[in-house]
């Protein structure tokens, strides 16, 4: 996987920005999952995390796992209070109307 930042990913895709406190964060992999306890133990530092989970607990998991960003799939959005927490914890959050699979396919092309 080539070196790419979250900012560069945004330039090469149609992903939307929800929060971007650390756009220079380097992406080193991709992880897909919605079961937070599972993601917490398996996502790697620097991963893009694709999920439909959009609550405060997902922000906490992204922080603990040190993911480069969260991509919310299928048009999922963040409530304003969750968005505020994401910004306070320096969690980049992007969104897409695509399914997790469609996002993963796009990322495999862009990140290779």
Predicted features along the sequence, with ranges:
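Absolute protein N-terminus
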Residues: 1-4, 112
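N-terminal first-folded block
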Residues: 3-47
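Feature captures the catalytic cores and cofactor-binding loops of soluble hydro-lyases/lyases
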Residues: 24-26, 36-48, 53-112
């Amino acid at each position: 996987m080539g070196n790419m930042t979250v900012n560069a990913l945004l330039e090469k895709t149609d992903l939307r920005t929800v929060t971007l406190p650390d756009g220079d964060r380097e992406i080193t992999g991709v992880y897909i999952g919605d079961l937070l306890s599972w993601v917490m133990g398996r996502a790697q530092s620097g991963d893009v995390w694709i999920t439909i989970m959009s609550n405060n607990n997902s922000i906490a998991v992204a922080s603990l796992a040190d993911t480069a960003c969260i991509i919310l799939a299928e048009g999922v959005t963040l409530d304003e209070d969750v968005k505020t927490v994401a910004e306070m914890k320096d969690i980049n959050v992007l969104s897409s109307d695509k399914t997790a699979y469609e996002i993963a396919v796009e990322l495999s092309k862009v990140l290779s």
